[in-house]
Amino acid sequence: GGVIDVVPSAVPADNRVFGDVTLLGKSVNGTIGGSLMLGIRKNAWYSHIRYSEQHFGDYRIPTDSIVYLTQRIPIYGRKLKNTAGIERNIGLFTQYQRRAYKANYAVSNVYQKTGFFPGAHGIPDASRVEDDGDSRNIELPFSKVNHLKVTTHQQYAWEKLILSGDLGFQNNHREEWSAFHTHYGSQPAPEKDPDKELAFNLNTFSASVKARFIGSSSWEHILGWDGQHQRNDISGYSFLLPEYRRSTTGMLWLTTYRPNNVFSVSGGVRYDYGYMNISSHEDTYLADYLRKQGYDPEQIDFYKWNSHSVNKHYGDYSLSLGLVWTPSDKHLVKVNIGRSFRLPGANELAANGVHHGTFRHEQGDANLK
């Protein structure tokens, strides 16, 4: 295990215009891509914009066949048909800093379209994986993802106090497309977008405030609050996750004591509260199918619900205490103890369907506490 800390690029010390170009290539799927960045530093202002794009073909694998649902599926040319894709990303960052005040603004958009291997999507059919002569086309089934993110960070520093705040908005739109298919003859194809199997539109609003108190050279405290609200809407002829509303908030206190360069103690406590409102989802076509098969009303009522309505409140605390001892340049000792709490996600409470992106069936448990 480990932790990766992604640190943003340092702001140039002097006024300048700068940029870079990066090219990318991979043999496993014929990836061709590149990234272009252009930036400027002018007195108190610093800005840069980056655009990246890559195209890739069907993935190569070291086998001539796979087994899916007990059926052997051939892999022609050792390439997974229809696993090609495209990615386009663009991001803009602007920062203003003057004396004790600093603010930055960021906007980014990430787009991806990738195909699904048809031999492992839906009912096994070897004819769907026959080589079509084009290793870079994207046909049904496929997925599309677009993620928009807008954030701002504001900060003001006094001699022994630093106040900061963040606001953010994210829109995550995901679609999975596959030729309309159903297990029940009574289910008609939708009039609009008949091949749209799944679609999720998740909007997230977030805010946070932190106050950092520097009492002395050896002691500092951080007091903070954050909150988030999410709304997820769905569409498509299949089902994986219901519509839901999720609101969370939390307060924290952290403290660090460093009497010298050899020893330090840090600790903190946090309390989180959350509310989850999940809509029920009824499969009327399954209910009709079971009714025609002669199931009794009690069995039909049990099986027809993809998800049940959930209205739950959650709240609990987390705490931690850590010691760091550095007796020499070659030795470091760390001791940590803590208790953690995490609010469950909507998928953990109410998912019920095949998630092709992770190649598994997911089923939530509404009784999680």
PLM regions and their residue ranges:
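Transmembrane beta-strands of outer-membrane beta-barrel proteins
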Residues: V17-V21, S47-I49, Y101-Y105, L161-L167, ...
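Structural signature of Gram-negative outer-membrane beta-barrels, strongest in the C-terminal barrel
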Residues: S218-I222, D226-Q230, G236-K369
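Transmembrane beta-strands of outer-membrane beta-barrel pores
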Residues: L23-N29, K42-A44, E53-G57, R98-A100, ...
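N-terminal periplasmic accessory domains that precede
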Residues: G1-L23, I32-M37
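Flexible loop and strand-edge segments within Gram-negative outer membrane beta-barrel domains
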Residues: K81-E87, Y101-E159, L163, F169-N203, ...
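Transmembrane beta-barrel wall of Gram-negative outer-membrane proteins
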Residues: N29-H55, Y68-F117, N146-W158, I214-W219, ...
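Solvent-exposed loop segments that connect transmembrane elements
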Residues: T63-R78, G119-R136, A179-D195, N277-V310, ...
